[in-house]
A protein has these predicted regions:
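N-terminal accessory beta-strand-rich subdomains and adjacent acidic, glycine-rich linkers
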Residues: 1-153
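An acidic-aromatic substrate-binding cleft motif
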Residues: 126-201
Length: 203
């Protein structure tokens, strides 16, 4: 947004960005849970159960839309991954709305109460200002979506790293065994498994 005359700041309360996908599209989406619910009122914590290969018309489990990244199968024509990048402390983290046949999926701002009274559900920005990126990665297979670096390519680094970091494959005990799997013996198993599979990392 450019600066208009003497205007120095503005409040962004929503976005008109929307994504319309072909009718044959099915979804692989993580539903956004209600604010301040769940264990220690930490939701939405982006760890809900994905539903696989669902029609776009299927409402989200909690009526609050979906957490990024959002994966779509375009029938037999390929795949699309919709996400965001470049969100920092002066903008809100967004998600996708439920599907609407007229508008598709739209960018949804945080729910009231999501910040637990700290911060806002809108963005107050100094002008000039650029909003975060909304990205779409397409592929005939999942390979380009898994290997994309778009989240890093379109943003300016916020700091200089002390070493070269490289994307790679990994194993992760917590994903399978949750908190009970975060112990020494299980980590050794996952380190060994990463080595056997030729993976670069263990989380």
């Amino acid at each position: 947004f450019p600066q208009y005359g003497e205007t120095r700041v503005m409040t962004i309360t929503g976005e008109a960005t929307s994504f319309r996908l072909p009718a044959q599209t099915t979804t692989f989406l993580c539903p956004q849970n209600k604010a301040m619910s769940g264990w220690m009122r930490t939701k939405p914590c982006y760890e809900e159960e994905y539903k696989l290969d669902m029609p776009m018309s299927e409402p989200s489990a909690f009526g609050e839309g979906y957490t990024f990244p959002c994966l779509f199968r375009i029938g037999g024509d390929g795949w699309a991954l919709v996400s965001e990048t470049g969100t920092c402390g002066n903008y809100v983290g967004c998600h996708l709305s439920d599907y609407n046949p007229d508008t598709g999926y739209t960018i949804a701002f945080p729910m009231p109460g999501e910040s637990n009274g700290i911060g806002q559900t809108s963005a107050g920005v100094a002008l000039p200002y650029s909003t975060p990126w909304r990205t779409i990665t397409l592929g005939e297979t999942l390979k380009p979506l898994v290997e994309t670096t778009i989240a890093y390519d379109v943003v300016e680094p916020m700091y200089q790293t002390t070493r070269q970091y490289k994307p790679g494959r990994y194993t992760w005990s917590w994903l399978l065994w949750q908190d009970g799997g975060t112990n020494y013996d299980d980590q050794v198993k996952f380190i060994d498994m990463s080595e056997r599979m030729g993976y670069e990392y263990v989380l």
